């Protein structure tokens, strides 16, 4: 049998190859724009980096999210937005992020066009909540997300259109809403025959 750490290294390579050739849903021009970073650790058991937003903030307080935020005029691109905001929120050194590319843009309930970027970071990358908006940073094993063990499915009614949104529970954290939907879209870019 192939060692587990070798399997994960092969998976990271497959993810990199697939993302670089992936043509996702582009940003919506007429909406305000934001970007988030889906950072995957380059380790024997890859993990995704999340933030828990502080209850002190009005928008998304107490919610789990990927690091990221709104596009600003000084940003060179949405990729730059994702990297800038991630560094501001988590202290993550943007120079150590190997961006593979974007996946499908999603539209939030506030009508913001959010583009996620997948990037590989060193397994021992330093994280600390740099912003008052962030209560803590934590990691979730990619293997947990690939198993798709949903805590529940939420029924959402948006202007008469009904759709279901997944929610995941990892330890005491609930991953739901736009962040959970982004995890589901990430599945589209991952190797379909990889078993964890």
Descriptions of predicted regions:
Residues 1-10:
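Short, Lys/Arg-enriched N-terminal segments with co-localized hydrophobic residues
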Residues 186-192:
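Conserved small/polar residues in nucleotide/adenosyl-binding loops
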Residues 56, 70-171, 175:
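Unchanged
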Residues 26-66:
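N-terminal strand-loop-strand
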Residues 10-28:
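Entry/capping segment at the start of metal-dependent catalytic domains
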């Amino acid at each position: 049998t192939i060692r587990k750490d070798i399997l994960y290294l092969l998976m990271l390579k497959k993810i990199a190859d697939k993302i670089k050739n992936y043509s996702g849903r582009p940003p919506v021009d007429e909406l305000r724009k934001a970007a988030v970073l889906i950072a995957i650790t380059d380790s024997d058991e890859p993990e995704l980096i999340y933030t828990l937003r502080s209850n002190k903030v009005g928008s998304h307080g107490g919610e789990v999210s990927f690091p990221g935020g709104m596009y600003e005029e000084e940003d060179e691109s949405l990729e730059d937005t994702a990297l800038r905001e991630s560094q501001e929120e988590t202290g993550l050194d943007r120079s150590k992020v190997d961006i593979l590319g974007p996946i499908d843009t999603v539209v939030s309930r506030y009508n913001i066009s959010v583009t996620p970027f997948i990037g590989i970071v060193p397994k021992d990358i330093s994280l600390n909540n740099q912003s008052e908006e962030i209560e803590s940073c934590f990691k979730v094993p990619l293997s947990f997300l690939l198993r798709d063990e949903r805590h529940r499915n939420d029924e959402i009614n948006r202007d008469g259109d009904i759709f279901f949104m997944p929610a995941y529970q990892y330890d005491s954290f609930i991953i739901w809403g736009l962040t959970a939907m982004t995890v589901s879209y990430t599945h589209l870019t991952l190797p379909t025959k990889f078993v964890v």
